[in-house]
Curated annotation (Swiss-Prot):
<feature type="region of interest" description="Disordered">
    <location>
        <begin position="43"/>
        <end position="62"/>
    </location>
</feature>
<feature type="compositionally biased region" description="Polar residues">
    <location>
        <begin position="168"/>
        <end position="184"/>
    </location>
</feature>
<dbReference type="GO" id="GO:0042102">
    <property type="term" value="P:positive regulation of T cell proliferation"/>
</dbReference>
<dbReference type="GO" id="GO:0009897">
    <property type="term" value="C:external side of plasma membrane"/>
</dbReference>
<dbReference type="GO" id="GO:0002250">
    <property type="term" value="P:adaptive immune response"/>
</dbReference>
<feature type="compositionally biased region" description="Basic and acidic residues">
    <location>
        <begin position="118"/>
        <end position="128"/>
    </location>
</feature>
<keyword id="KW-0472">Membrane</keyword>
<feature type="transmembrane region" description="Helical; Signal-anchor for type III membrane protein">
    <location>
        <begin position="79"/>
        <end position="99"/>
    </location>
</feature>
<dbReference type="InterPro" id="IPR022338">
    <property type="entry name" value="TNFR_13C"/>
</dbReference>
<dbReference type="GO" id="GO:0031295">
    <property type="term" value="P:T cell costimulation"/>
</dbReference>
<keyword id="KW-1133">Transmembrane helix</keyword>
<dbReference type="GO" id="GO:0031296">
    <property type="term" value="P:B cell costimulation"/>
</dbReference>
<comment type="function">
    <text>B-cell receptor specific for TNFSF13B/TALL1/BAFF/BLyS. Promotes the survival of mature B-cells and the B-cell response.</text>
</comment>
<dbReference type="GO" id="GO:0038023">
    <property type="term" value="F:signaling receptor activity"/>
</dbReference>
<feature type="repeat" description="TNFR-Cys; truncated">
    <location>
        <begin position="18"/>
        <end position="35"/>
    </location>
</feature>
<feature type="topological domain" description="Extracellular">
    <location>
        <begin position="1"/>
        <end position="78"/>
    </location>
</feature>
<feature type="topological domain" description="Cytoplasmic">
    <location>
        <begin position="100"/>
        <end position="184"/>
    </location>
</feature>
Length: 184
């Protein structure tokens, strides 16, 4: 059961139709469409260079000498747009760095000019960072920690952590509710 050679058109393709000079044949929809919808140059009028009108079997209208000019925007978008975006980001980063550096320089200059405005080293120190203790007697004999009443190793903790009851089965629900003082 051998089949003959397959057609390039496919089984359900319509018969080749000639297109008018203002239209180009589109292989995707297999019909004549306006050439402006395709990225092809306008078809040349039939003259000495074209022996017959173009048909569906002659898709040279969609690929030809003008295909290079139509494909130019694609590499420009693929390489040009990311390059411009990268340059814009680098420029923004440089500007942010310059602004922060200038602010830091101003702050350092302002601090140095505030320390010695007249060059007088005997000037009183500003009281911005001086801590003033309240008057009173400090109790130097008070212990830092109260003495332990009981040994913490032998006393049970005041709270309990719920653990799963494995002897009842693995499907038992364990809640985090703790026992209050009335239940102990």
């Amino acid at each position: 059961m051998r089949r003959g050679p397959r057609s390039l058109r496919g089984r359900d393709a319509p018969a080749p139709t000639p297109c008018v000079p203002a239209e180009c044949f589109d292989l995707l929809v297999r019909h004549c469409v306006a050439c402006g919808l395709l990225r092809t140059p306008r078809p040349k009028p039939a003259g000495a260079s074209s022996p017959a009108p173009r048909t569906a079997l002659q898709p040279q209208e969609s690929v030809g000498a003008g295909a290079g000019e139509a494909a130019l925007p694609l590499p420009g978008l693929l390489f040009g747009a990311p390059a411009l975006l990268g340059l814009a980001l680098v420029l923004a980063l440089v500007l942010v760095g310059l602004v922060s550096w200038r602010r830091r320089q101003r702050r350092l200059r302002g601090a140095s000019s505030a320390e010695a405005p007249d060059g007088d080293k005997d000037a009183p120190e500003p009281l911005d960072k001086v801590i003033i203790l309240s008057p009173g007697i400090s109790d130097a004999t008070a212990p830092a920690w109260p003495p332990p009443g009981e040994d913490p190793g032998t006393t049970p903790p005041g709270h309990s952590v719920p653990v799963p009851a494995t002897e009842l089965g693995s499907t038992e629900l364990v809640t985090t509710k703790t026992a209050g003082p009335e239940q102990q």
